[in-house]
């Protein structure tokens, strides 16, 4: 809902600098808000002084990220249009996050194991991760899976 509202405001050329208040949400949802055009993120539970800082920063032409969102810029670069996962890559990432092996994924999707391995390498490259553990951590941040 939040990202759609931000997009609506931007599509109607309303001159507004949008700060989003977020509760507990996966990083991918925060990133969707930012990609939609929000200028900052502040947690609902943050001290009111952080909102004042956000307003000051944004009114001076900067963006503002609550300290818990500091990874948003780093992570959002992983989801730029150049790095967007394909539907197949997203599907494979979900299966990896579910604990499936390359062989199990290949059987399930009726692909060769080599094709799955290639998709996995492409996913890791796009997400700028270098190990299976980093891949799972990123999947958690994206909201692909939960603990």
Swiss-Prot record:
Pfam assignment, any one: GerE
Name all HTH luxR-type domain ranges. 78-143
Q: What CDD domains does UniProt report for this protein, alphabetically?
A: LuxR_C_like (cd06170)
Output the superkingdom of the source species: Bacteria
Q: Which GO terms describe its molecular function?
A: DNA binding
Record feature DNA-binding region, as residue ranges: 102-121
Q: Which InterPro entries match?
A: CheY-like_superfamily, Sig_transdc_resp-reg_C-effctor, Sig_transdc_resp-reg_receiver, Tscrpt_reg_LuxR_C
Question: What PTM annotation applies here?
Answer: Overexpressed protein is phosphorylated in vitro by non-cognate histidine kinases BarA and UhpB.
Listed GO biological process terms: phosphorelay signal transduction system; regulation of DNA-templated transcription
Q: What extra comment accompanies this record?
A: Lacks the N-terminal receiver domain usually found in response regulators, which is usally phosphorylated by the cognate histidine kinase.
Q: PANTHER family, per this entry?
A: DNA-BINDING TRANSCRIPTIONAL ACTIVATOR DEVR_DOSR
Protein name in UniProt: Uncharacterized response regulatory protein YgeK
Q: Which gene encodes it?
A: ygeK
């Amino acid at each position: 809902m939040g990202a759609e509202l931000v997009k609506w405001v931007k599509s109607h050329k309303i001159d507004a600098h949008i700060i989003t208040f977020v509760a507990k949400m996966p990083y991918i949802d925060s990133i969707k808000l930012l990609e939609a055009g929000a200028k900052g993120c502040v947690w609902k539970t943050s001290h009111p002084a952080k909102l004042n800082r956000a307003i000051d920063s944004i009114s001076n032409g900067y963006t503002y990220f609550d300290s818990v969102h500091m990874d948003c810029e780093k992570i959002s670069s992983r989801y730029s249009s150049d790095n967007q996962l394909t539907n197949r890559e997203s599907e494979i990432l979900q299966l990896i996050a579910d604990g499936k092996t390359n062989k199990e994924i290949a059987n399930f999707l009726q692909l060769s194991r080599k094709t799955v391995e290639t998709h996995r390498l492409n996913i890791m490259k796009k997400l700028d991760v270098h190990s299976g553990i980093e891949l799972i951590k990123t999947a958690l941040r994206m909201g692909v899976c939960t603990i």
